[in-house]
Design a protein with these regions (language model features):
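Alpha-helical scaffold segments in soluble metabolic enzymes
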Residues: 10, 14, 56-59, 63, ...
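Short loop/turn motifs at secondary-structure junctions
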Residues: 19-21, 64, 207
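Conserved beta-loop-beta/alpha segment of the NTase-like Rossmann-fold superfamily
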Residues: 32-99
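Short, conserved catalytic or adaptor-binding loops enriched in Gly and charged residues
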Residues: 37-41, 102-109, 139-140
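Left-handed beta-helix
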Residues: 75, 108-110, 114-214
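A glycine-centered loop/beta-turn motif at secondary-structure junctions
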Residues: 83-118, 125, 129
Length: 214
């Protein structure tokens, strides 16, 4: 996980927000059951057996129209350039590659490299990416009218929702599916996990778990 959130969860929710409607997740068949809890319930997902992914993906994509987004490996929705780990191509061109190689071993014709993603191959790269992720999340909340007094001393899970006019004070940790209302003051030194905090509520130096406040 990064900032308390599994990478798979963050990526699926981010891509759904960008308009991706259907997901084909390729992995070892034995891992499918382990992955399901980390995928949003409202996501349209097909799990593909990694050992037979070429033929299975070909069967799934043959009737698809339009563009397909390919994500290779663990990737975070931050950064400037994906280095080719994330790219889009026409479904028909994707099928041609699968027929020829049995996998996405080459870029489909007309493929476009997608920006705004960061591949992470190991724990060290994941740790290095944390500051960038924290900044991206803070910027999203800034744009929505939230004030974060010290972004370098505030940790917000990407799943958290915060209403406009709310002020987040230093030392605050917001985790899980927490929802903070409008015009609240949170912190300093508050830890809130999987809670709903109503509008115009103040939470000061408290630890809240799975609760509704305000």
């Amino acid at each position: 996980p990064i900032l308390f959130c599994p990478i798979l969860t963050w990526m699926v929710e981010e891509l759904m927000g960008r308009g991706i409607e259907r997901f084909f997740i390729v992995s070892d068949k034995r891992a499918h059951d382990m992955m399901r809890p980390y995928v949003p319930e409202n996501a349209d997902v097909v799990y593909v057996d990694g050992a037979r992914h070429g033929e299975e993906l070909l069967a799934l994509l043959k009737d698809e129209k339009g563009s397909v987004l390919i994500v290779n490996g663990a990737v975070l929705p931050v950064g400037v350039f994906s280095g080719g780990a994330v790219y889009s191509a026409d479904a028909k061109e994707c099928c041609k590659v699968l027929k020829e190689h049995g996998a996405f071993a080459a870029f489909p014709k007309g493929a476009e490299i997608s920006k705004g993603f960061l591949p992470v191959g190991d724990d060290e790269e994941l740790r290095s990416a944390q500051d960038m992720c924290r900044r991206k999340i803070a910027d999203r909340h800034f744009a929505a009218g939230v004030s974060i007094m010290d972004p370098n001393n505030t940790y917000i899970d990407p799943r958290v929702k915060i209403g406009s006019g709310t002020v987040i004070l230093p030392g605050t940790i917001l985790r899980g599916r927490t929802v903070i209302g409008k015009n609240c003051t949170i912190g300093p030194n508050a830890m809130i996990r999987d809670c709903t905090v109503g509008d115009e509520t103040e939470v000061n130096a408290s630890q809240l778990n799975e609760s509704t406040v305000g």
